[in-house]
Amino acid sequence: MKLLKPTWVNHNGKPIFSVDIHPDGTKFATGGQGQDSGKVVIWNMSPVLQEDDEKDENIPKMLCQMDNHLACVNCVRWSNSGMYLASGGDDKLIMVWKRATYIGPSTVFGSSGKLANVEQWRCVSILRNHSGDVMDVAWSPHDAWLASCSVDNTVVIWNAVKFPEILATLRGHSGLVKGLTWDPVGKYIASQADDRSLKVWRTLDWQLETSITKPFDECGGTTHVLRLSWSPDGHYLVSAHAMNNSGPTAQIIEREGWKTNMDFVGHRKAVTVVKFNPKIFKKKQKNGSSAKPSCPYCCCAVGSKDRSLSVWLTCLKRPLVVIHELFDKSIMDISWTLNGLGILVCSMDGSVAFLDFSQDELGDPLSEEEKSRIHQSTYGKSLAIMTEAQLSTAVIENPEMLKYQRRQQQQQLDQKSAATREMGSATSVAGVVNGESLEDIRKNLLKKQVETRTADGRRRITPLCIAQLDTGDFSTAFFNSIPLSGSLAGTMLSSHSSPQLLPLDSSTPNSFGASKPCTEPVVAASARPAGDSVNKDSMNATSTPAALSPSVLTTPSKIEPMKAFDSRFTERSKATPGAPALTSMTPTAVERLKEQNLVKELRPRDLLESSSDSDEKVPLAKASSLSKRKLELEVETVEKKKKGRPRKDSRLMPVSLSVQSPAALTAEKEAMCLSAPALALKLPIPSPQRAFTLQVSSDPSMYIEVENEVTVVGGVKLSRLKCNREGKEWETVLTSRILTAAGSCDVVCVACEKRMLSVFSTCGRRLLSPILLPSPISTLHCTGSYVMALTAAATLSVWDVHRQVVVVKEESLHSILAGSDMTVSQILLTQHGIPVMNLSDGKAYCFNPSLSTWNLVSDKQDSLAQCADFRSSLPSQDAMLCSGPLAIIQGRTSNSGRQAARLFSVPHVVQQETTLAYLENQVAAALTLQSSHEYRHWLLVYARYLVNEGFEYRLREICKDLLGPVHYSTGSQWESTVVGLRKRELLKELLPVIGQNLRFQRLFTECQEQLDILRDK
């Protein structure tokens, strides 16, 4: 054995409370007290191991120093992969560090340039939950969890895959928790506290397995830490500070029955730290060959307040070596090298000691295969503790399952090789970043410098900071980084997780109500029918550019046809009638229209009075009693306008639908919020215009022109309808004035006075006799062969004019508007004739013709979207751009909710439940909207999440429904298709998803065999 105390490892005389050696053995970290802050220092291991390297001035001893902790650092621990370093301190924080390969060294802050950081380490996540000093941190054996304990009497389990998510908070100690340790396979975690107890917790459900108190009855809270340790074979757990016959010991606790019959004795004062060697050894004979009946044993180091260190072998009754007065103060921490032959010890006196053993002294270490067999004999092969490596060695019973597994492994190898190439190209100083050399990047930055001339002609150049370029070694472990105010934080994924996905921009407003709801919606402007146009802002916010609504424009009576597409007259919307996306008119726009004399002041009128210029009168039953309570808003327009091109600021903006309110008007000029009265609903009626033009679509080019009150022979006035499609024009005349128009690539329809609705083909042929509406028209829409009419009485009808069938028959909006001050802000008619109403409160309802019910398909205030997290279940980035009616309705609201949820800790169980509920809502909404590609997308995401989380019952139910009966039965109610998709084809798409998890290979085999039987039939 060799003993060394490197004097250059110090914290400038301050205490060192923790030490840990990197898994690759090239460096080690120390944590302790700094100058007015906590200090974490990363040191080079080579000068400790080799005397020549220590003397070589070209070999740096200190690699990096971090002073980010606000108070003393009590513990530093490397992850088992060596990628991350966790540190906990008296500032109640746990910081997770990761190396960042910058170009060139930097100096330590406050060192006047004397100390240089050879390596750059940055804090990638700050974990905040403890209310007291953090005493110890520990990574689980497979880096899936990070545990921390504190003087607040709690142990917190963090999800190391998704920092800062908290999986569990273990409460049970009544004193300061000062030590943590995991068992070798991560099945248990043990904690020791000042309440004279040691508790063992199960990781399966995070519940208490056992509490051991007898060996600690005589103990007092005299130690700064209580670092206990679990043996690498899993058989023994050794505690810190215990007492036996009033003498300090390290208590040995057997896993079998948690018996406490043995202990390590000999120290004169309380034991502060126990650390097992990571290797399991077997005895070595003198001739160099291992003994045949060799029994494996472990090695353990014990440190005490008596400043001495003892090293024990479990095959010996006495310690292998004892070193007295190794330090001037208490031993605080111990760390073994990964090969098991070296040990670092730190003390409160601010010094470090290194002990180097030989194999002759400790024995021959067992191989990893032999170590794994010992673990299996101790813990078994429970799926609850099986790692990915163990699953990969499991027996695969199906050759198709093997094919999917090999394909998945090949994808992982391709990703790793790509990441390796990126890291290799970033190591050289003259490397390339994104296809551009670093020198070129610096030159391009210099080109952007700002140069000005002073009054006397001298040049003045504004200094430009050229930051050091961070070129590596960032792996795909990070999904996203969300900056926190005043701190550095980020979310982290393991290197085995799904490929990195680009987060959607949550700042983009929702095309279907994602922006702030208008609290004061206005009625339709007289210059155009309500709800028939879309402004540029709403088009930019729409997630699918192929689904926009037509544009209505107000023009002089004699407008030239092609000028309808000029930017001076229209908003150049690339509209198709498939899915209108409307926005509300703001009060500012209303005031601007009033200033241009395009809109007169609003005035109340009797509810039961017919619309202006209508020849039909409604009988007045109780006019005297109702006239004071029921009001109607009428908007009139000034027909005397200047000839020629309208002013730029006088263009009309899209207007939202609003529902009539029974409340009395307090001021005529005040914009009113119209709500649904208890007795009746009243929607605004478009006023007749002299002329207007409607752009139906841009591809193919199609627009409609309407001209009212065209004088013919004999003084008779008619209305003219013109349609131009790709240069081919047709026109027809009607006897009544046209109030509003709509069109699609299949039909053109107009609503006239006297409640008449006329439908024409795109060639001008009348398809139906005029339809008499139950009340005056309010809004008209067309999609394909479907025509939707929303009347002033808030009744909705949808017809399929080609098949001449009714889809929705005079359905009232009372059920979705009654009882509150809500307004209809936007309307959508899907390609399958499903009407969707988006309300001002952010909720969207669609009418289900099969059930004759209004179904909720979207809610902007949905809390499920804020907690749901299914990033790992998304197949690719392209899948996130799934378009359709559901995507238009919801926009990007759900993504912003998930981004916001990352800033707050959500328990894993709660997040699991909310994610399942959210995905099931998405599948049901896509089914209700009859959107086949969205239904397929969300079904695959839902199934992938079930596979990842291990929900076999729900997954099996989905497979059973998609498979159907194998043998045909006349009484079977099973439908072979869903929203136009074949169920069994969907099941074939699910099989590769199921095949990614070996736990479901039985389900995979069952489904595949039954599909083969059906195929043979």
UniProtKB/Swiss-Prot annotation:
In the record, biological process GO terms are:
anatomical structure morphogenesis; chromatin remodeling; DNA-templated transcription; gastrulation; muscle cell differentiation; nucleosome assembly; osteoblast differentiation; regulation of transcription by RNA polymerase II
Q: Which keywords appear in this protein's UniProt record, sorted alphabetically?
A: Chromatin regulator, Nucleus, Phosphoprotein, Repeat, Repressor, Transcription, Transcription regulation, Ubl conjugation, WD repeat
Specify the effect of R460K: Impairs binding to ASF1A
Region labeled Interaction with CCNA1 — which residues?
A: 421-729
**Where in the body, by tissue, does this protein show up?**
Expressed at high levels in kidney, pancreas and skeletal muscle and at lower levels in brain, heart, liver, lung, and placenta.
The record's section on Pfam families has: Beta-prop_CAF1B_HIR1 (PF24105), Hira (PF07569)
UniProt function note? Cooperates with ASF1A to promote replication-independent chromatin assembly. Required for the periodic repression of histone gene transcription during the cell cycle. Required for the formation of senescence-associated heterochromatin foci (SAHF) and efficient senescence-associated cell cycle exit.
Which protein is depicted?
Answer: Protein HIRA
Organism per entry: Homo sapiens
